[in-house]
Design a protein with these regions (language model features):
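An edge-strand/N-cap motif at the start of beta-rich repeat modules
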Residues: 1-30
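Residue position within the beta-strands of beta-propeller blades
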Residues: 4-7, 54-55, 96-97, 139-141, ...
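A short loop-to-beta-strand structural motif that recurs across blades of beta-propeller domains
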Residues: 17-20, 61-64, 102-106, 152-156, ...
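A short beta-strand motif characteristic of beta-propeller blades
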Residues: 27-36, 70-77, 113-121, 163-169, ...
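Blade-level signature of beta-propeller repeat domains, shared across WD40, Kelch, NHL, RCC1
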Residues: 244-276
Length: 276
């Protein structure tokens, strides 16, 4: 199963501005889709049921690709959308973090109708990843934006309630992305202080019930692990995190770093997915 990575460009990183593919040994397979509607790609989520890949494009649109890399669904350009990460919700809709509006919005899977704000605009200073837990709660990373605005926490939203509760208070956290682990806990890619040359980069696991820090995943000496971004659990159960020049793997069961599975200079990865 190929590993796909969105490589940033522009203010998000001096990458390739493309959706790149790698084989199971980490060897590059080239660009997965050359469609001109893909520019500075961000969020990336595989829908294994429909065998589609949803991609948030820096061209202010959301796309869905088939297994051959052809765009088969397109919202069309949406002025000011500026999408970040994406995830499917318990209602089946495709949810997207909005950087300008500082909220989360929901599109129908068909991408043929306008989205609806799931949370109020400006709910956080700068959204940095989100995911739905087992009980339908939404966990939203509130991080630091490109100009330094923001805070460093994880907020929780109960179903049918857009009033947040501050779940995580961790002085070592500056979230970049988050995912729900097989055990129901929250795992978060962190770079603290955000943007600093000597930032401490980790993946941190928090209890979904009370937000306490469970454990910290570290690269040790196996990789530089600069500018960590997207997180994804693979079909093998391992936890993967894309970064500036590599994709790292961690054994989630014992917390050990397995090293790099992809090494690619200037990758500046934003998100990753195993597809098809």
């Amino acid at each position: 199963m190929p590993l796909l990575v969105t490589s940033a460009s522009g203010v998000n990183g001096n990458g390739y501005g493309a959706l790149l593919a790698f084989d199971r040994n980490g060897a590059p397979l080239g660009v997965f889709c050359n469609d001109e509607r893909i520019a500075d790609p961000r969020g990336l989520v595989a829908d294994q049921h429909e065998r589609l890949l949803y991609l948030n494009s820096g061209q202010d649109r959301v796309l869905a690709l088939d297994t051959g890399g052809t765009v088969v669904r397109d919202t069309g350009p949406i002025e000011g959308l500026n999408p970040g990460g994406g995830n499917f919700g318990p209602d089946g809709r495709y949810y997207v973090g909005l950087r300008n509006a500082r909220t989360v919005t929901a599109f129908p899977r068909t991408l043929d109708a306008p989205s609806e704000h799931f949370l109020a605009p400006g709910i956080v200073p700068f959204p940095r990843g989100f995911a739905f837990g087992r009980n339908g709660r939404l966990f939203l990373g509130s991080g630091i934006g490109p100009t330094g605005e923001g805070d460093n926490t994880i907020l929780a939203f109960a179903p049918n309630n857009d009033m947040p509760s501050r779940l995580v208070s961790d002085p070592g956290l500056s979230p970049l992305d988050l995912a729900i682990a097989p055990n129901g806990n929250i795992v978060v890619a962190s770079e603290y202080p955000f943007g600093a040359a000597d930032a401490v980069t980790t993946v941190r696991e928090y209890d979904a019930a009370d937000g306490h820090l469970v454990r910290v995943f570290r690269p040790k000496d196996l990789a530089e692990f600069r500018r960590p971004r997207g997180l994804r659990f693979g079909p093998d159960g391992n936890l993967y995190c894309v970064a500036q020049d590599e994709v790292m793997a961690f054994d989630f069961a014992n917390g050990e770093c397995l090293g790099t599975v992809v090494q690619f200079p200037r990758l500046h990865g934003q998100a990753l997915a195993f597809f098809p």
